[in-house]
Regions:
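A short alpha-helical cap/connector motif
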Residues: 1-147, 151-155
């Protein structure tokens, strides 16, 4: 029986990349290049589809070129965990550390709780800019991949 999940059958070619881009567009709202209108539910994927697909291809090529597997993932800015879960489907990280405030506003609780499951995740509920948080996160490293998508204050 063939495995029809797009993340299980990664192919480093243009046709697969276009197919993956269409999948990501369907997950995103129109404001960021997708097909869905944002309804305020916090259940949409909040990344630019082209950027996330290019990132996945870049990381897969990095693994192949270096003959390594990305195993330890640090994400700064977990939000509802959609990005975290999506990347984990492609890389099946051995260890995931995520740092973010846990704020009830703007995040769908069902999406949040569903994205805490089925992976080796440690969620640190703290301010990623504080020295104590940085120290705690450092102790849990080293990391093969760090994705920064938090603290959008630009201060």
């Amino acid at each position: 029986m063939p495995n029809n999940y797009i993340f299980k059958n990664f192919k480093n070619n243009k046709a697969y990349k276009l197919q993956l881009l269409e999948v990501v567009k369907k997950m995103c709202n129109m404001e960021i290049g997708g097909y869905k209108f944002y309804d305020g539910s916090g259940t949409h994927y909040m990344q630019n589809p082209n950027e996330i697909v290019n990132l996945i291809f870049h990381l897969k090529n990095f693994e192949k070129k270096r003959k390594i597997k990305l195993e330890n993932f640090l994400e700064i800015g977990f939000a509802a965990g959609i990005n975290n879960s999506f990347l984990n489907k492609f890389f099946n990280f051995k260890k995931i550390i995520a740092v973010d405030y846990v704020s009830p506003g703007g995040i769908n609780k069902e999406t949040f709780f569903s994205n805490l499951r089925f992976k080796n995740l440690t969620l640190i509920c703290a301010d990623s800019t504080k020295k104590e948080t940085i120290k705690n996160v450092s102790v849990l490293g080293p990391y093969d991949f760090i994705f920064i998508d938090g603290g959008h204050s630009y201060e």
